[in-house]
């Protein structure tokens, strides 16, 4: 049954060459841990992507119960944590995954830097990778406010004060994020939710697509 459906689609769209090109792509020997023990350092990028996928899936689950409103945000998180089946586990995965993905990205960045993989002709991919790092930090920052408890509120105020310290445009950046130059309230929560769920993920998907395309085009850099 499934084979017939696949054959029907393949006959019209010729999808076999596309997925075979991905599935049959040969992995260079120097990045295969089976041949070189030190090759495990090349796994940090893939592990970062794996944790990112977990973050996306767990985040989609959380948005089904979360209410981005100052009257209901904390209650919705409490309900998710204590009443929803597997809610505590999924939220824990998302919470710890947010820290783990930063750690993995940091290790991946160190590997690229110390092995000189950012040099010609991969300078543009290095820039894209740095942008991905900043987007990830932004996701962590905006997500921290969403439970709307005292710890999140005070941490967000500190973060907004840091943004306000930006030369020339600091006040505008703070107002853009908070929705008000002086008050951290309903508009702040709504904006952080929108940035966390829509704007930054859209930027992340676009940058990651560019990152992978350039890796496929240029190949994985060799060892020092």
Swiss-Prot record:
Cofactor binding, per record: Binds 2 heme b groups non-covalently with two histidine residues as axial ligands. Binds one heme group covalently by a single cysteine link with no axial amino acid ligand.
Predominant subcellular localization, coarse grouping: membrane
Any one annotated GO CC term: plasma membrane
Membrane topology term: Multi-pass membrane protein
SUPFAM superfamilies per the UniProt record, alphabetical: Transmembrane di-heme cytochromes
Binding site for heme c: 43, 216, 220
InterPro entries: Cyt_b/b6_N, Cytb/b6-like_sf, Di-haem_cyt_TM
Keywords per UniProt: Cell membrane, Electron transport, Heme, Iron, Membrane, Metal-binding, Transmembrane, Transmembrane helix, Transport
Gene Ontology process terms (BP): respiratory electron transport chain
Binding site for heme b 2: 91, 94, 196
Membrane-spanning residues: 37-57, 96-116, 126-146, 195-215
Cellular localisation: Cell membrane
Keyword Ubl conjugation among record annotations: no
GO molecular function, one term: electron transfer activity
Function: Component of the menaquinol:cytochrome c reductase complex.
The protein's assembly and partners: The main subunits of the menaquinol:cytochrome c complex are a Rieske-type iron-sulfur protein (QcrA), a cytochrome b (QcrB) and a cytochrome c (QcrC).
Note: This cytochrome b is similar to other bacterial and plant chloroplast cytochrome b6 proteins in binding one of three hemes with a single thioether bond.
Family: Belongs to the cytochrome b family.
Name under which the protein is recorded: Menaquinol:cytochrome c reductase cytochrome b subunit
Name of the coding gene: qcrB
